[in-house]
Amino acid sequence: MSTLNTILIDFKLTPGWGLARTLARATGEEWIIEQRQTNQFHGSPVANVWRMMWYFLFPLQVVLRRKRYRRIVAWQQFFGLNFAFWCRLLHLRKVSDLTVLTFIYKRKPGFLGNLYHRYMTYCVNSPYVDRIVCYSREERELYAAAFGTRPERFVHLQLGIAPIERPNCDDRGYIFASGRSNRNYDFLLDVLRGTTHKCVIACDNYTPRHPYDNVTVLHDCFDEQMIDMMAHCRCVAIPLKDATVSSGQLVILQAMSLGKPVICSDVAGIKDYVEPGTAVMIPNDVAAWRDALLRLFTDEAFARQIAGQGHELFLSRFSEQAMHERIARVVANSCCYGR
């Protein structure tokens, strides 16, 4: 039986990323990292086609060498789901324990939405998938119902990120919002209409229905540039659309790491990441958001308190290493398949 294991990632690997080392300590086995950077393919129909293509082709490459691996951890959910897709489609013998991370799903309307749901159900219920990690407690029951499977198939773990080091995080007086998944930027613009607050939105697939003098939308702001924009904002806004969809956790942790106050929609997926006094969490009510933003801009003590308590919470519970250790405990306790 092989004791070689692999992690499938879709981002540019940094030297300090320690999941492989943490998994090696927990399992007593060798771990390697296989990378296919797909998070760069955004912003145009052609880029989206390339990204989708690699979501299927890279897992197929892994399938061809699957007998090398005792355990597979898919950081990019579609790398893991499509590994299971190919194995099920080709009726291959199961030889690897598969953990799928960073899972998120929202049902879409219409013919394509139904087709996507059938594809996701086929993958999620595949016998080649051993567990799927989601980042809020409520999702386990929601996803189990959506895909007609048992809740135990889904494992809840809290997200974590590496601390963001920025020596200069001066406040330049604008609201910053970023992210694609489940965002309700139209609501945020309704909040800002008629106010003097300036706002910068970093999102490659959002265009306002009408121009706003106080709102700038950046379609090509990613990675370090996005973090730089966040580092100089007054506060970070996370307006979310569907209360049942897990989203916004990464941005809230980035803001807390930088010591920026957060205002966000009151949704279930965020509640696992905040405590009283660490963020302004309110329903999507225009008047309530306007009042909260006004206070964040005019009450310095309040803004500093929210930012400071959020930063302390991040350091104590949401570091990247803490997340890696949570993943390692789940994977190390898994049943593995011989051949």
Regions found by a protein language model. Give the residues of each.
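Short hydrophobic beta-strand element within catalytic cores of glycosyltransferases
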Residues: S257, P261-C264, M281
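Donor nucleotide-sugar binding/catalytic pocket of nucleotide-sugar-dependent glycosyltransferases
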Residues: V129-A144, T149-E165
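Short acidic/histidine- and often glycine-rich active-site loop of Leloir-type glycosyltransferases
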Residues: H210-P211, V267-M281
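Acidic donor-binding loop of glycosyltransferase active sites
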Residues: M230-S247, K260-P261
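Conserved catalytic-core segment of nucleotide-activated headgroup transferases in glycan assembly
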Residues: D170-D213, V217-E224
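Membrane-proximal helix-turn-helix segments that form the acceptor-binding/catalytic region
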Residues: L60-R68, L92, F111-I132
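Conserved acidic donor-binding segment of nucleotide-sugar-dependent glycosyltransferases
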Residues: P276-A287, L294-A301, S316
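A short, well-ordered alpha-helix in the C-terminal region of glycosyltransferases
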Residues: R295, F302-R317, M323-R329
